């Protein structure tokens, strides 16, 4: 009863606060639909907010404003608006808007995804840039990725005629790719539901669900500490479960390094241990890497397979190119540069099915002017990568799956072409773009 009473008091208080703030809100915000008291525009979002945002952009333009509870949110919906947010005003708009449920176990303070652009964040980015996502490291790991891919193919052939959950097989393969990059060993045995990877997948997917679900504390700050729906507890449980998957491996490696003649494998875990990072920083960094590099990639590959099924001519064109360039042998990563149609297919998949339809929310560190509108300090900024990829003003016949549109185009997805930003851009661009490119 106490929780209900506190919630009612908070809601009544927020109503009056909303009415006061609405009268004194800063002028010059981008246009947007009229908000309701307390809930703002929350009821207009539905289950696929990126789709609703794209519809709102047709009415309100490049930038529009929403009220999500008491939170002011500005949404960028065109390449021009994305360029302004992610490039022209990158430094001012590089703050992170962090969900209340994720503020557990000091994860945010040690996360390359959620932390502010402070010294810890810079240190973690530097480790990734200079030790993990280097051209040399990518090339050295090419053989491992090819081996794991062939293991997946053999597993699928072995189970021909038997129903398999393809996304789980892809996920397990990607986990093993990262497992070998980081720990020099597999984490997942394909087809073995008792292995640690299945538990990891469940925890990571649950965290992504929580990140995409409404939490009253995110929109009504007075409710933030109550955890009314148990989301913060769920995230804490997920973090504990994921950390447990590789916790024993980290402990074992630390012991080996302490021994005078300890046999260490000189992989990425050794790099992390030698870099002076503590266990919390290592755990958060590994979680960021596994969650960003496995589930989202598996989802994108699943969409790619779906498009192949729906578009037999595209499948035939890819097969023809492979036979012409590669022949009947297995495809190697070194072949990709000579497969322009396959590259175009990947870009088209990312255009229509970006791994993160709405880029991770940013926050304005200071008030600034964007496209002649005022973006107030602490405002949340979202970039609709899904909507930008389907913008009829940018793309001809935008809903048609057509890799041919990229054959004579220089547009790429590495953060310089704002028509295609599946991995973001600016200082917050996904640090794993190079290996992501290698995988798909």
Swiss-Prot record:
The keyword Heme applies. The keyword Iron applies. Signal peptide: none annotated. One of its GO terms (molecular function) is heme binding. Pfam families: p450. Disulfide bonds: none annotated. Keywords: Alkaloid metabolism, Heme, Iron, Membrane, Metal-binding, Monooxygenase, Oxidoreductase, Signal-anchor, Transmembrane, Transmembrane helix. GO terms for biological process: isoquinoline alkaloid biosynthetic process. GO terms for cellular component: membrane. It is a single-pass membrane protein. Belongs to the cytochrome P450 family. This is (S)-N-methylcoclaurine 3'-hydroxylase-like protein. It comes from Papaver somniferum (Opium poppy). The lineage of its organism: Eukaryota, Viridiplantae, Streptophyta, Embryophyta, Tracheophyta. The gene is CYP80BX.
């Amino acid at each position: 009863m106490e929780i209900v009473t506190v919630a009612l008091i908070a809601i009544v208080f927020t109503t009056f606060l909303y009415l006061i703030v609405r009268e004194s809100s800063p002028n010059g915000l981008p246009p947007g639909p009229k908000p309701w008291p307390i809930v703002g525009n929350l009821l207009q979002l539905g289950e696929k907010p990126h789709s609703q945002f794209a519809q709102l952009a047709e009415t309100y333009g490049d930038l529009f404003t929403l009220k999500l509870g008491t939170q002011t949110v500005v949404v960028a919906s065109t390449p021009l608006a994305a360029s302004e947010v992610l490039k022209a005003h990158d430094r001012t708009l590089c703050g992170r808007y962090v969900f209340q449920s994720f503020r557990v176990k000091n994860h945010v303070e040690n996360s390359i995804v959620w932390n502010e652009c402070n010294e810890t964040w810079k240190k973690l980015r530097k480790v990734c840039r200079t030790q993990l996502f280097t051209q040399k490291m990518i090339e050295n790991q090419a053989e491992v990725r090819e081996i794991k891919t062939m293991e997946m193919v053999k597993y699928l052939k072995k189970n021909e005629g038997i129903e398999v959950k393809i996304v789980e097989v892809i996920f397990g393969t990607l986990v093993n790719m990262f497992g070998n990059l980081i720990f020099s060993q597999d984490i997942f045995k394909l087809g073995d539901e008792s292995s640690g990877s299945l538990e990891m997948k469940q925890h990571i997917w649950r965290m992504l669900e929580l990140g995409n679900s409404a939490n009253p504390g995110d929109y009504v700050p007075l409710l933030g500490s109550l955890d009314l729906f148990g989301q913060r507890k769920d995230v804490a449980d997920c973090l504990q479960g994921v950390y447990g998957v590789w916790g024993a491996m980290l402990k074992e490696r630390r012991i080996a390094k302490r021994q005078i003649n300890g046999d260490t494998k000189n992989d990425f875990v050794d790099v992390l241990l030698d870099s002076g990072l503590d266990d919390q920083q290592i755990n958060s960094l590994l979680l960021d890497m596994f969650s960003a590099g496995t589930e989202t990639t598996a989802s994108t590959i699943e969409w790619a397979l779906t498009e192949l099924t729906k578009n037999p001519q595209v499948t035939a064109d890819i097969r023809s190119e492979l036979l012409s360039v590669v022949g009947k042998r297995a495809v190697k990563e070194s072949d990709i540069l000579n497969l322009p149609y396959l590259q175009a297919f990947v870009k088209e998949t990312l255009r229509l099915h970006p791994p993160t339809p709405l880029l991770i929310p940013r926050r304005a560190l200071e008030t600034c002017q964007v496209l002649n509108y005022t973006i107030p300090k602490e405002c949340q900024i979202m970039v609709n990568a899904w909507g930008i990829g389907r913008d009829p003003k940018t793309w001809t016949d935008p809903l048609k799956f057509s890799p041919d549109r990229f054959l004579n185009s220089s547009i790429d997805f590495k953060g310089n072409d704002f028509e295609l930003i599946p991995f973001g851009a600016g200082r917050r661009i996904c640090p794993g773009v190079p290996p992501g490119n290698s995988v798909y």
